[in-house]
Amino acid sequence: MADLSALKEIATTAEPAAPVHVKKVDAQGRSYATGKRKDAVARVWVKAGSGKITVNGKPFSAYFARPVLQMILQQPIVAAARDGQFDVDATVAGGGLSGQAGAVRHGIAKALTYFEPGLRSVLKRGGFLTRDSRVVERKKYGRAKARRSFQFSKR
């Protein structure tokens, strides 16, 4: 009976093991993740390569013409100091261009952590793994928009 109580003590005092992040790669050597932002949903595949990024079959510089959106897309790769080492293939649907760029960025960051679990702390510190939950506030009845009231007339 003493052996059993000793085992119970060990089981209750043992600290929970830290979650082990294992590399998740498919048969073609790609890591898959989904990214979301506003109404946009991106499906992202990352594999070792030369740094080529395609979005919906086009080069990312052709799909996202504005330099700000191109910069948003590259942020997780630059933060992880892995520019030119990964090929990214993404399909994105829904929302506008800004939301789509944010969704692809979120997906790239998640896929990088699946491909190389050691990058998780760097990307987490940069805030790339957190889903940006801000969405458009709904319109309320009795108002012109979500917060704007109809014009008030004293007389």
From Swiss-Prot:
InterPro entries: Ribosomal_Su5_D2-typ_SF (IPR020568), Ribosomal_uS9 (IPR000754), Ribosomal_uS9_bac/plastid (IPR023035), Ribosomal_uS9_CS (IPR020574), Ribsml_uS5_D2-typ_fold_subgr (IPR014721). The keyword Ribonucleoprotein applies. GO terms for molecular function: RNA binding; structural constituent of ribosome. It comes from the Bacteria. GO terms for cellular component: cytosolic small ribosomal subunit. Keywords: Ribonucleoprotein, Ribosomal protein. One of its GO terms (biological process) is translation. Belongs to the universal ribosomal protein uS9 family. This is Small ribosomal subunit protein uS9. It comes from Sinorhizobium fredii (strain NBRC 101917 / NGR234).
